[in-house]
Amino acid sequence: MTKKLIVISCVLTILIGLCGCAGAVKYPSYYTLHVPPPPDPSAQGNVHAILAVREFRSPAYLRQGAIVYKTSPEQIGFYNYHRWATDPRGFVTNAVADRLRAGGTFTQVKPYDGRPDVDYVLSGQLEKLEEIDYEGGVKVEVAISAQMVQLSTGTVVWTNSVSEAAPVDKRDVPTVVSVMNHTMEQAIEKLLAPGPRVSIQQSAATMRGSQ
């Protein structure tokens, strides 16, 4: 009888332990990138050109979903329980396209689908989006590059790159993400200042070619 009680007691202890472990399951927190929306589109003037925007590329480690930090230039770490809700590449692509659309330089700005019914194609790369934990203190770094090609000639008519960094006052992931958002906004603004431009001569040639 005593042995049975001991066995039952052990089983109950194990079950209680398992329940405790189940209650301690940790779920990921998800974060979004956000920048203020661009102003309403301005008047288009005499330029009549269509721009297609390819999805921005990025290094493989930025496509894993987890927020990235670096403890040295060579070492990359991941916050496995702090992840992006959406792919940062798609966010940057849409944010850049929205601002180009609002700039009024092009009659239409649309996602690139491989069709030749556009005048220009813009492509780019999100090169850095990470927390930096070396060189004293904590900061975030965002780096973006882009170029625009005239489809009819294959000529690169515009290119730019930018790298922005900002300190993080409080080291926790929500604060890091907030600083990343602000730094991303600055990086996109500088990338597109000055942004792609289309001359009236190029626009006129495009119109003649489409007739």
Which role does the model predict for each range below?
Residues M1-C10:
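Bacterial N-terminal signal peptides that target proteins for export
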Residues I16-G20:
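C-terminal motif of bacterial Sec signal peptides marking the signal peptidase cleavage site
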Residues C21-R89, R197-Q211:
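A structural "domain/chain start" motif
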Residues A22-P41, D98, G103-T155:
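Surface-exposed short loop/turn segments
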Residues F56, Q125-L129, S163-E164:
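Generic short beta-strand segments
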Residues E74-R83, S152-A193:
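Short secondary-structure boundary motifs at beta->alpha junctions and helix caps
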Residues R89, T93-A97, G103, N181-I188, ...:
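Extracytoplasmic/secreted envelope proteins and their assembly/folding machinery
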